[in-house]
Amino acid sequence: MPLYHFDLVNTKTILDEGGAELHDDIEAMDSADTIARRVLDERPDLKDRHYFILVTNEDGEEVFRLPLEIIH
């Protein structure tokens, strides 16, 4: 299974060092949504500060970008 990374990005990047092995890009996008919701549960102050979850594959290519602002 491919390895995906989920970094929290604003002016600085908090890297996902370990990543997660997932079936495909769709599952990675679903995981990004789960991670974003968890981040906002723990740090609601980040919602309106232009943070996003950057999903990359094992080759470092961007798969998806999920702005925290759109999470309800």
Task: Tell where the protein language model's regions lie, with residue ranges.
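A short, structured loop/turn motif at beta-sheet edges
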Residues: 1, 24-27, 58-60
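Short aromatic-glycine-(Arg/Gly/Cys) micro-motifs in beta-strand/loop hairpins
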Residues: 1-15
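A generic structural signal for short beta-strands and their flanking turns/coil linkers
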Residues: 2-4, 18, 49-51
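A short, exposed loop/beta-hairpin motif centered on an aromatic-Gly-Thr core
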Residues: 14-25
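A short, charged, amphipathic alpha-helix used as a generic interaction element across diverse proteins
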Residues: 24-44
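Short, mixed-charge low-complexity intrinsically disordered segments
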Residues: 38-72
